[in-house]
Amino acid sequence: MQNASLASIISENREYWTGRAASYSEVNLGELATSQRKKWSFCLRSEISRQFPDRAPSQIRVLEAGTGPGFFAILLCELGYDVTAVDLTPAMLVEAKKNAGPLAGRICFLEMNAESLDFPDSCFDVVVSRNLTWNLPHPDRAYIEWARALKPGGLLLNFDANWYAYLFDDEAQAAYEQDRINSAAQGVGDQNVGENFDAMEDIARRVPLSDIYRPVWDLELLSSLGLQAEADEQIWKRVWSEQEKLNFSSTPLFLVRARKLSGASAPGYSAR
């Protein structure tokens, strides 16, 4: 029953995010129109430059897993990287291409499941993702695939949070409710309630990461794959807007940063 439930999540996710594509695109456009654009661009450039200090962006091939309406793909293309962006939902890719405007022709947008990449081994220098792994039915498979697609010496950057932990933990539930109170008191719109919110909560109850403490889980898995992994649990302070800090105080964004060691040949990301 559990396996059947997880298998259905792929189609449910596609259906849900098809319905959310337009409104989620508006959220991304808002980020592109504010200081978030500069904050995130600086963050991405700094992380990648630290790993590849002597290489020009045009020589660095980047994969974004779960691009959604294209926020990261657009920023990375503006920074000069060679960008491929994949998403499970065709409607999201339509929004991403639209949002990219004249940059769309420089970004390779592909419909693809982040848990099963249609790329050869060791073909990307960097893999990036934001707010995706929590929503996956098999996040371990996604990490295995991302590690496989990374070149030796490559960099993985995954920005995520313990979204929906409040469904399983009383303390997290109380903190979540306090976020709602604080946001209302400050006159800030509640970003935690989107279209068809009940449907997403239903999915969140069934995906494996909602009741697992992260990023500890991520670091343990990546280390088991032979990657050198660490977490930055203060990244939210540098990239979130004041509105996001109020809305999501109880679920701060973290960054999982992992490096595939040069010459590594660890179980889990060998050729399929």
Which residues make up each language-model segment?
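Conserved class I S-adenosyl-L-methionine
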Residues: 1-57, 72-75, 155-191
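Class I SAM-dependent methyltransferase SAM/SAH-binding core
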Residues: 63-65, 69-116
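A short acidic, Gly/Pro-enriched loop at the edge of an enzyme's catalytic core
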Residues: 115-126
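A short SAM/SAH-binding and catalytic strip from SAM-dependent methyltransferases
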Residues: 126-139
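A short glycine-rich, Lys/Arg-flanked "PGG" loop and its adjoining helix->strand segment in the class I
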Residues: 140-152
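Short alpha-helix
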Residues: 209-226, 231-232
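Core SAM-dependent methyltransferase catalytic element
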Residues: 225, 242-272
